[in-house]
Amino acid sequence: MKVNLLIFTIILCPTLCFGELFLEITKGSEDPYKVAMIPFEGNSRLSKELNFIMQNDLIRTGEFSILDEKLLLPLQIIDDELVYNDWKLLGMDYLVTGKIIKTNNSLDINYEIYDIHKKRKIRSSKVFGIPNQIRQLAHYTSDGI
């Protein structure tokens, strides 16, 4: 009898324990990180497409607020040092810059992330891709940010 009960429990338990979890994010962070994204150097058409996808990825997380492109300042570098004060006046927490490198059979992205408050580069990375997969490359890059 105990064996039959055990077998019945083993068979029935997984079906009873199965439940669907539905998670809906309706609101982002109360204080999202403020990020300025300079259009990447290189092919301007690809740069616009990359920036659009990456910005949307970051905004959808709810953790980031992206500075409107119309408010971007020219990137100032003096003696190989980024001028951080301009970005601090705009209330930015981070600055993202990058370069698109296109060769015959690859499309690579080099990008840097700067912490405006600490006045230093906090990440420098390279993402490798193929030319006809620009969307995937943009998603990989935004994942790194």
What residue ranges belong to the model's regions?
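Amphipathic beta-strand/beta-sheet edge segments enriched in Tyr/Trp
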Residues: L21, Q55, D79-S142
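Positively charged n-region of N-terminal signal peptides that target proteins for export
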Residues: M1-L5
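Short beta-strand->alpha-helix linker/helix-N-cap micro-motif
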Residues: T26-N85
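Boundary at the C-terminal end of the N-terminal hydrophobic targeting segment
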Residues: C17-G19
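Residues at beta-strand starts and edge strands
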Residues: L6, D31-K34, Y94, N105-L107
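Gram-negative bacterial Sec-dependent N-terminal signal peptides
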Residues: I10-I11
